[in-house]
Amino acid sequence: MRLSVSLLALAFGSLVAAAPNTKPRTCGSKPSMEFLAKSAEFAAKEASGELLNSLATIEVETYFHVVASGRTPSQGYLSDAMLANQLRVMNSDYGPHGIQFNLVRTTRTVNANWARDGDELGMKRALRQGGYNALNVYFLGDLGSLLGYCYFPTNASPGSTAFIRDGCVVVGQSVPGGNISNYNLGKTATHEVGHWFGGCFGSGDGVSDTPPQRSSTQGCPSSRDSCPGGGVDPIHNYMDYSYDVCMNQFTSGQRTRIYNMWNQYRARG
């Protein structure tokens, strides 16, 4: 699912020199029909108690890839401290649900074309590491009108295009210490990794304890109820599109869905 950010989107600029951008974000792409069918199947089984996750914890082999146009922060070259803070945010957000990200390796590449997402497949062929149970996060210097995007789990054989593309692409400016006002606390990575686990947006995720929404949340309202009768909107949920400071929760149903998706698609590697 791609996170669009320009008018309904957020233009990328310098980590240091650019003025903070405060435009809202929204999601511009849809999960595949295969994924939606599997989600509906899981929803039915979870509701009946037929399908329950069996793992107590998930440990995720994690690789960070910094892809910049040059060797300065303004060109997307993130420091070790910024990456450490991003990992800390991810573990803080997922840790209460028994999920831990173990950083195995960080790579840094200077390639102006890759840094602006000019050759996604070529970049990932060169940089991707680990099996299908390994999370690869690519921090790019310039995503144009995008804040980030990630691929939902599927039946991907090693070496296939789906296997190579797997992972999350995040604009480097969104990590803690970046300069995007309202979106620089590292929650973009948390949100995108949610898609990697199989989490979807609350308006149609099929999870029983996430109320339906007519549209994604923008900003950080005190309360919102876009679908009267279904419960107030989950504006604090990591899979919504609120400001970073507003995001602080997954539901127990989302945890169950993440574990079931993990068992289905990623646990075997």
Swiss-Prot record:
Catalytic center residues: 192
Skewed-composition ranges (Polar residues): 210-225
Gene3D superfamilies recorded: Collagenase (Catalytic Domain) (3.40.390.10)
Binding site for Zn(2+): 191, 195
PROSITE patterns noted in UniProt: ZINC_PROTEASE
Record keywords: Disulfide bond, Glycoprotein, Hydrolase, Metal-binding, Metalloprotease, Protease, Secreted, Signal, Zinc
UniProt subcellular location: Secreted
Glycosylation sites: 179
EC number: 3.4.24.-
Listed InterPro entries: MetalloPept_cat_dom_sf, Peptidase_M43
Name of the protein in question: Extracellular metalloprotease UREG_07765
Organism whose genome encodes this protein: Uncinocarpus reesii (strain UAMH 1704)
Upper lineage: Eukaryota, Fungi, Dikarya, Ascomycota, Pezizomycotina
